[in-house]
């Protein structure tokens, strides 16, 4: 399997180590991107990705290596430390660029055959809301099977995480990896994803892009 990790930070702290720990348990074929190092642009709200083509986005070429890696991957891992109870600004800015891929707009067919994981860490709290920020995108992209893992590490860096906590993280990532590997031969969207897709198909107007094609 091919795995791509999108790190919501450029430093290699607890979130990085946990995401990488999970990835190597799934596959040896791993690509990693660090935000904002590998992509740090903000969506400018031009709406060209909705009304014309994603290729009209002023950041299309900068984003293309990550887009291609996600499209080629079997597993997408989105990882972000908690910043004020949410994802990092870099992760949010990154996800904003894929609004056009939400099921209500122009979903990418390959997403319905992928698995995705959201990982977040904090010294204390905020993992639930941070994971939701990322899970929303995985769901509305149509990613067939989704997993999440949030953990309070009670430390400001990986070296400060207790051995007891690291053992618990090791166990949790092994469990997720086993589920991903087990499910890899039978990737189908669940009822919730199928239901949302048909709602979007039946109750949304054709996009300007589709109207131009017809």
Name these PLM-found stretches.
Residues 7, 34, 149-150:
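Residue-level recognition of beta-strand->loop/alpha-helix junctions
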Residues 203-214:
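Single conserved hydrophobic/aromatic residue that forms the stacking wall/gate
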């Amino acid at each position: 399997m091919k795995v791509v990790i999108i790190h919501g930070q450029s430093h290699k702290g607890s979130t990085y180590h946990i995401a990488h720990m999970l990835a190597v348990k799934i596959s040896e074929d791993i690509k990693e991107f660090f935000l904002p190092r590998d992509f740090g642009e903000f969506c400018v709200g031009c709406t060209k990705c909705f009304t014309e083509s994603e290729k009209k986005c002023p950041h299309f070429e900068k984003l293309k290596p990550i887009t291609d890696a996600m499209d080629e991957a079997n597993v997408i891992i989105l990882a972000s430390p908690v910043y004020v109870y949410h994802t990092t600004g870099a992760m949010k800015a990154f996800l904003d660029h894929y609004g056009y891929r939400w099921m209500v707009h122009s979903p990418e067919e390959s997403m319905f055959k992928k698995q995705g994981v959201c990982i977040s860490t904090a010294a204390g709290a905020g993992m639930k809301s941070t994971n939701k920020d990322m899970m929303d995108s995985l769901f509305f992209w149509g990613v067939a099977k989704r997993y999440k893992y949030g953990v309070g590490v009670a430390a400001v860096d990986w070296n400060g995480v207790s051995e007891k906590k690291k053992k618990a993280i090791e166990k949790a990532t092994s469990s997720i990896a086993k589920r991903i590997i087990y499910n890899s031969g039978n990737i189908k969207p669940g009822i919730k994803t199928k239901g949302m897709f048909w709602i979007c198909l039946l109750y949304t107007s054709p996009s300007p892009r589709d109207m131009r094609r017809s």
